[in-house]
Every structure is written in structure tokens, then in C-alpha cells.
Swiss-Prot record:
Part of the twin-arginine translocation (Tat) system that transports large folded proteins containing a characteristic twin-arginine motif in their signal peptide across membranes. TatA could form the protein-conducting channel of the Tat system. The gene is tatA. Signal peptide: none annotated. This is Sec-independent protein translocase protein TatA. The keyword DNA-binding does not apply. It comes from Stenotrophomonas maltophilia (strain R551-3).
């Protein structure tokens, strides 16, 4: 009563294939795979210390901080 058997899942899969078609399902799976890949890449990049990043990224952060401070000053 609690969980579904393999036959229930096969029927659900068949209905999903009939409703959406294989082309939409493969493109959706491809999009999901690329999203997971980008997420993992972002997590790896986040783990790198700032010393390993190039000078360009540090200068962009400094200019962004200066602009933020300029935007917060009262006029």
C-alpha cells in the first residue's frame, strides 16, 4: 500500500511519453544535465581562494565596491 511497484512506474512512464513525446523529454533531460553541470562548475569556482583568481576579477570587485559606496553617499 505504501510504495509503488515497478509496474506502476512503467505505466506512469508510458503516459508521460504519450503526453510529452520523446523529443521534449530528451531536450528537457539535456537542459537538466547542463544545469547540473553549471551548478557543479559554480561550486568548484566558489571553493577557489581569491589568490588564485586573476588580477582582472579583483579590479572588477574593487571598482564595483567603489561604485556601491558612491551610490550610498547622501546628496
Amino acid at each position: 500500500m505504501g510504495s509503488f511497484s515497478i509496474w506502476h512506474w512503467l505505466v506512469v512512464l508510458a503516459i508521460v511519453l504519450l503526453v510529452f513525446g520523446t523529443k521534449r523529454l530528451t531536450s528537457g533531460a539535456k537542459d537538466l544535465g547542463s544545469a547540473v553541470k553549471e551548478f557543479k562548475k559554480g561550486m568548484r569556482d566558489e571553493d577557489k581562494p581569491n589568490a588564485q583568481l586573476g588580477d582582472e576579477s579583483r579590479s572588477q570587485d574593487a571598482s564595483r565596491t567603489a561604485q556601491d559606496e558612491h551610490d550610498r553617499t547622501p546628496r
